[in-house]
Every structure is written in C-alpha cells, then in structure tokens.
C-alpha cells in the first residue's frame, strides 16, 4: 500500500458502532488471520522458537529480593495508592499472557475471547455431550451488507476475470499465513484458488472482498464454499470458511470482524446456518486437534532454508541417504486417475469415509472436481486390479510456500496428503509410492495430518512431527470432541 491515497485510507479507524461490527476475537486481529481452512500455521518442521533475550537485573545493594524495587516505589510515591499499583500490575500480567493468539489449550485458558463469548460455539471449558445446533435457524436475516467506514467498499470478486484473480493471488501471497518465525508464507497459485473456491454449487457472492474506495486496491477477503458434512450421525448442509486475509497495514483495525459478519450474513441468506473451518490457533472450541507431520524429499534444500535441521550426530550426507527413495513405484496397476474412474473412486471414497465422525459427502460431481488431476494443483493415482476394478487410490495437492530472506531459494514445493483409500494394497505401500511420485514431480516435502488412518504410516515412512497443531471447528453446532483418527475431512 505505497500510494499516498491508499496510505491515508489505511489510517482510518475501522472501529464501527456495535450494531455494525463483529469479530472472531475482538482483542486480537492476528488471531483472525489464522482462521482458515488451509493447512494451519505449521509451515516449518521442528523449528525451535527464537528465545527472547532478557536483560539481567542488577541485585540491589541491600541484597533484598528483586521485587523490593516495587515495594520501595510504593513508599516513595505515597500519592499512588497501593490498590492502584496492584491494579496496574494485574493489568500488565494480563497483557503479558494475552499478547498474540493462543497456540495451545493452556494459553487459551488465559485468553479473553470477547467475540466468541457472544457466538453460537461451545465455551472452552464446556463439556459437550449432546449433538445439535446451538441456535435455531434465523427467520429474519439482514438484507443489506454491513457498513464499512468511509474510504472502503465491498466487492464481490469475479474469479473468472484474470485480473481479479491475480489481485487475490497477490493479496494472499503478500499477507496470508506465515510460520511463527516469518520465514515461509503460503503461495496459493491463481489456478489453485479457482480449484479451491469454485467447487460444484459455489456462489459468486461468497467470494467477499474489501477494497480501498479511492484506488480500488484489494485489501481484504474471505470465502465460503458449500459442503455436505456428516457430524457423527447427522448430515448437514454447511459451508467451509477459508482464506480470511487482511492486508498487513490494516491489521488491528477491525477489518476481519466485519468480513466474518458479512460472510455469515451472505451464507444465512442461502438458508445455511452451520460452518466448518480450521485454524492454527486455539479458539472456542475445537471439535478436534490434529498435528502436521513432514516427510523430507529434498533434505539438502530443507536444511538450507531452515525448514528442518540436522539431527545430532547426523551429517547432511547421512540425512540424504536416510530419506532416499526408489526411482519407481512398486504397486502393480498404479496409474493416474482419469475421467472414466470417477464413478469407482466415488464409491470407494464414500465407503471409506463412512467410518469417520466428521466427514464430507461427495457425489460424482464433487469427486470429479476435487480429484481429477490438474498440474500443480491436485494429483490422484488409482490402483486398477483385474477386470478394470479399482481397489485403492491416493491423492495429494500442491501448495508451495514462499521462502523469505534466502539468497538462493525462493520457493518450497510442498505436497499435502488429501484422501487415501486402501482395500487391497497395504496403506504403507500406497503412501510409499505417493512419496516416490511426489519426489519424481519435484516436491521438496510431503506433509500429512495425523487424521483418518494416517498414523499407521507416519513414523514407519520417516515422517517427522511438526511444531504446530491444526484445530477443527464447527460454527453453530455442538457435539462431543473426537480424536484425530476419527476426522475424515481435509480442507485446503
């Protein structure tokens, strides 16, 4: 946002009156940036957090405890009542514990969730044993968009327009999810965005943007796509919320809350009142918590960009040998999925997913969209047995990350495990072939969550555990929490 007019607009306060604003968390806009259906904030594997340097405190001349300074200050400043000082101290302690989004349950219990406390979601400390909506479906839904402050405007993004698609790509590429050390940022390609945002049943007004009125620069975005989701024994028409992004120069200016409220209004107008989403931070209240695992395919590059590090007593050469893969796959009948396979893949997928508590329901149109291979977007391979019968399939999608601040490497090509079904071939053999195929296609790392059956192969195939979780959430629906192996839903 370099232009003068744009900079001026960005300085305007986005604080709206109560009737026109909302927030995922009214205290922390950064938390809002982490609410997404994408693979969380765990872009780096097993990286240690940078230690904050602390200045050493000089001992007092009297050899008393370090907090004696505050005691003496109370004596030296009789105009400040002790109660006031204690209030200030408590406020400072509260600030120190609540700065930044909560990464785990312990941090979350100390966090204030002003927005979520008003929303139809379970409280963090609530023990949920029932199933069903938290609020009934609304009958009277606001017809007009929520108001934005002067200088900003709503815009429904037409992703069939190449220029608009490029604008969205640029916004996400420069402002979307980064790892904790600001070394990697997701790099969704324009064609990937069209794939992720235009499945069967998509609606154009669910691609919700915010622009600067003066120069029409895109500075905010949120999306919803329709999905039929099974939650335990209940089938609900929902939306998947994804790609919530606000320009960095507008952070802490209450843009994300308005985006959330507006997409909720637009979804409600279509008669849908439940949503599913994922986040790398802890909000009230996760229905499940999964962990990312990473399998090195190009160890040299991963070490050079500090995505991973050499283990103790391991040289680079030994590490490369450890992760070396065969040059060809081993499963007989393994081939690329084609149009003729859609019907059988749909049947395999539906039967496989029926064992999980949280799962999508996909017909042939959805399977055709999500699984038919597209270069640098989605790869699917099927195993064809005798008589043309399909027995298994594997799939993974492509999501590179921009490597920041590195003189040589600018991008990290990552494969993300999507849906894998096995009936004849052992899962570990299928996934080993998936690693080989990804390596042959030039991927640097293969990522997988520990959901569905994935725990059966992660350690055996030399995946390393990542340093972040991915929480699954339901909006306006309560149900008992579930273990990762009962989650059968993967969001981009």
Swiss-Prot record:
One of its GO terms (biological process) is protein localization to membrane. Its EC number is 2.3.1.97. It holds the Pfam family NMT_C. One of its GO terms (molecular function) is peptidyl-lysine N6-myristoyltransferase activity. InterPro entries: Acyl_CoA_acyltransferase, NMT, NMT_C, NMT_CS, NMT_N. It is an enzyme of class 2 (transferase). It is a peripheral membrane protein. Residues 1-77 are annotated as: Disordered. Residues 61-72 have a biased composition (Polar residues). This is Glycylpeptide N-tetradecanoyltransferase 2. The lineage of its organism: Eukaryota, Metazoa, Chordata, Craniata, Vertebrata. Belongs to the NMT family. Adds a myristoyl group to the N-terminal glycine residue of certain cellular and viral proteins. Also able to mediate N-terminal lysine myristoylation of proteins. It is found in: Cytoplasm; Membrane. One of its GO terms (cellular component) is membrane. Tetradecanoyl-CoA binds at residues 111, 116, 244, 246, 252, 254-256. Residues 15-32 have a biased composition (Acidic residues). Residues 46-57 have a biased composition (Basic residues). It catalyses: N-terminal glycyl-[protein] + tetradecanoyl-CoA = N-tetradecanoylglycyl-[protein] + CoA + H(+); N-terminal glycyl-L-lysyl-[protein] + tetradecanoyl-CoA = N-terminal glycyl-(N(6)-tetradecanoyl)-L-lysyl-[protein] + CoA + H(+). Keywords: Acyltransferase, Cytoplasm, Membrane, Transferase. It comes from Danio rerio.
């Amino acid at each position: 946002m370099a232009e003068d007019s744009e900079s001026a607009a960005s300085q305007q306060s986005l604080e709206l009156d109560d009737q026109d604003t909302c927030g995922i968390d009214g205290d922390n806009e950064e938390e809002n940036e982490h609410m997404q259906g994408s693979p969380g904030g765990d872009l780096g594997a097993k990286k240690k957090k940078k230690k904050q340097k602390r200045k050493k405190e000089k001992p007092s001349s009297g050899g008393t405890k370090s907090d004696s300074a505050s005691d003496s200050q109370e004596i030296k400043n009789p105009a400040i009542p002790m109660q006031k000082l204690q209030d200030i101290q408590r406020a400072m302690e509260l600030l120190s514990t609540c700065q930044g989004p909560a990464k785990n349950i312990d941090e979350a219990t100390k966090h204030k969730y002003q927005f979520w406390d008003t929303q139809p979601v379970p409280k963090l400390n609530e023990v949920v044993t029932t199933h069903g909506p938290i609020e009934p479906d609304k009958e009277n839904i606001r017809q007009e968009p929520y108001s934005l402050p002067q200088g900003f405007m709503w815009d429904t993004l037409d992703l069939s327009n190449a220029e608009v698609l490029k604008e969205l790509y640029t916004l996400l590429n420069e402002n979307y999810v980064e790892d904790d050390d600001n070394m990697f940022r997701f790099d969704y390609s324009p064609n990937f965005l069209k794939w992720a945002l235009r499945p069967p049943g998509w609606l154009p007004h669910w691609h919700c943007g915010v622009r600067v009125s003066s120069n029409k620069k895109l500075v905010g975005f949120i999306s919803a796509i329709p999905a039929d989701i099974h939650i335990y024994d209940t089938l609900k028409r929902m939306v998947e919320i994804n790609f919530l992004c606000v320009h960095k120069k507008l952070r802490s200016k209450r843009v994300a809350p308005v985006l959330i409220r507006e997409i909720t209004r637009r979804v409600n107008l279509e008669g849908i009142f439940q949503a599913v989403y994922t986040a790398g931070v802890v909000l009230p209240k996760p229905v499940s918590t999964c962990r990312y695992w990473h399998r090195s395919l190009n160890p040299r590059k991963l070490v050079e960009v500090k995505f991973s590090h050499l283990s103790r007593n391991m040289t680079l050469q030994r590490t490369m040998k450890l992760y070396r893969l065969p040059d060809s796959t081993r499963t007989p009948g393994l081939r690329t999925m084609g149009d003729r396979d859609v019907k059988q893949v749909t049947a395999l997928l539906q039967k496989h997913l029926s064992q999980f508590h949280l799962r999508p329901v996909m017909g042939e149109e959805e399977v055709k969209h999500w699984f038919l291979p597209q270069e640098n977007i989605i790869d699917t391979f099927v195993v064809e047995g005798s008589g043309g019968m399909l027995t298994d399939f594997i799939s993974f999608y492509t999501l590179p990350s921009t490597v920041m601040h590195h003189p040589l490497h600018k991008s990290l090509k990552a494969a993300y495990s999507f849906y894998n079904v096995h009936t004849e071939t052992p899962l570990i053999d299928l996934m080993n072939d998936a690693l080989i195929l990804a390596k042959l296609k030039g991927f640097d790392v293969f990522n997988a969550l520990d959901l569905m059956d994935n725990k059966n192969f992660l350690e055996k195939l030399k995946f390393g555990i990542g340093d972040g979780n991915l929480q699954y959430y339901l909006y306006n629906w309560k149900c008992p929490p579930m273990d990762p192996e009962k989650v059968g839903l993967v969001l981009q």
